[in-house]
Amino acid sequence: MHSAYHPPMRSMLLLVILAFLGARMGSPCQAETLLGSWHFQGSRQISQMDGGHVLKSVLEEESSLAVVELLVKKLASAPDQLFYGLGNSAHSERVAILQPIMADLIAYESYGEVHGITFPVLNLSMAIRLTDEKQLEWNQRLRRHAAHLGWEVHPPLSEGFTANWEASPQRSGQLMRFGQAGEWLIISIGSDVLTQWTDWQTAILSDTFPPKPTDGSWLSLQMEIDSLAHFSGHDSKPAVERVRVDWSGDGDHIRTTGFIQTKEELDETVESWSIPVNRIVDPVISFSTQRNLAPLISSLPGVKKLFADSIPKQSVAWSKPSKVQNPRGEQQTAPWFLNYITWPVEEDQQSVTPIQERAKAWLGESFLSHRRVDLVGDAEANHAVMKITPGFVQPFVQGYAYGDQFYQMAGLTFVNISRTNPPPAALLGQIENHPRLRYYHWELTGEKVFQYRNLFNLGGFLFGKGQMLKDSPLFSWTVMLENRLGNAVTQLLRKDERTLEIQRKSHLGLTGFEIAVLARWMHADVFPWIHGPSLTDWHLAELQSPRP
């Protein structure tokens, strides 16, 4: 298990690489703001800890080992992409120098903090618990890498300081500091601030390190969302102030706990669930409900544009199986995307025409004027459909009534449901008589991995952003996960007026959507970086005409 890789650690690795390789030195007199921190036990220790049996067996699969190999190589290529441009090929010698270090970040225990100075000035302090042999190897490899970049390696510039060495380029303010304290190797990148370094050394020598004990968690992450927004100068005000998540083993499963601290107060009073069971046709592979989360829901992309008058106080979402068996043979047909969401509305708000008009304004004339798109509505039938060629998905919104309540419903595949086959009563029973419950999500994770992998590939095809196909080890990895991952349940519970408690029990610590997003991200040429325009520019690709 020494080479095993824990999927939730990808977030921690990004945090490490982002600050470790992209920091710029700031003035020592500038105040630092904590942006995030982590504590990871390392796969070597996790393999000896209780629980997570499904995850541990998954990590021994050949497809998982291939993904780990790909991950380590991409992380080792990250510095060159940062310094010389995203998408450029990394220097093979520098990649070879860093690959064992990236593998050690997965295998050994580490703690780190990222601080912001003034955008884009960052400071990373990281400590990793290594054997003497490994500390020597890191010393040699990091010296070689700095020298290969043309950085000057020299003794500490601070008099009386206990670092082994420092390195900096000749023409910029970047600074790297390397030192040792007992079993821990300490590295800082960025601003020349010594306080944190000396505090950590003191804590290590007094056996009080790491400074934030995690009580047996395999991985702990804390992100200061509000501080990140202020640091980056982002105009929008985040709905979330702080998030902390902890992962640990629990029998066959991974237990995920934590909290979300919101900027606005959460309403204590709740209405009873309003669920139109005649629309939710069994079988389903996922079922979600939310209520009284308007401060969070309104921060999602497009929500305020589509719901200018009022954000729905509650909603129910579900999806049906995407795998479709061809009745004429064993081969499967193209997957269906039977994903739906519905929410109650007042009688005078049941018309979907306002949503249709807002969608036009949000999507823009250039998108809707494309010859492959047609947004049409029927006021009498109270529905609107976006017809896209080819027609794998046909997003729609419609209004309807169930009993005395009026609803609106949206989905990716327009369907007229005329029969009643409600989901199991036990599933609906999970959300009843639970006054603190604000969000509930159940899924068959393997089925959802299949669904989202194909949905993301469809998006890549329609918008010319590429697809993750069978020649990628990540494709084989997600196919393997389809057959290994079962039930997952996530809950958000109101703890106090500004805190939501996170609870999840799953096989991998992640939902199918999260797994598919991470696989798609790792597949990108620029991983672990993010190419901003690829997330903001959405134009339908021109399809090539078939050859005669």
What is each model feature region?
Residues 1-13:
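Positively charged n-region of N-terminal signal peptides that target proteins for export
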Residues 12-24:
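Bacterial N-terminal signal peptides
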Residues 29-166, 170-171, 214-237, 255-372, ...:
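Structural boundary/hinge residues at secondary-structure and domain interfaces
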Residues 103-112, 173-178, 237-251, 311-323, ...:
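Broad, structure-driven detector of short, well-ordered beta-strand segments within folded domains
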Residues 125, 129, 188-191, 343-344, ...:
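Extracellular/lumenal glycan-associated surfaces
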Residues 161-187, 371-412, 538-548:
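Short, intrinsically disordered low-complexity segments
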Residues 172-235, 392-474:
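A conserved glycine-rich beta-strand in the N-terminal activation segment of trypsin-fold
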Residues 413-538, 542, 547:
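Long, C-terminal catalytic modules of enzymes
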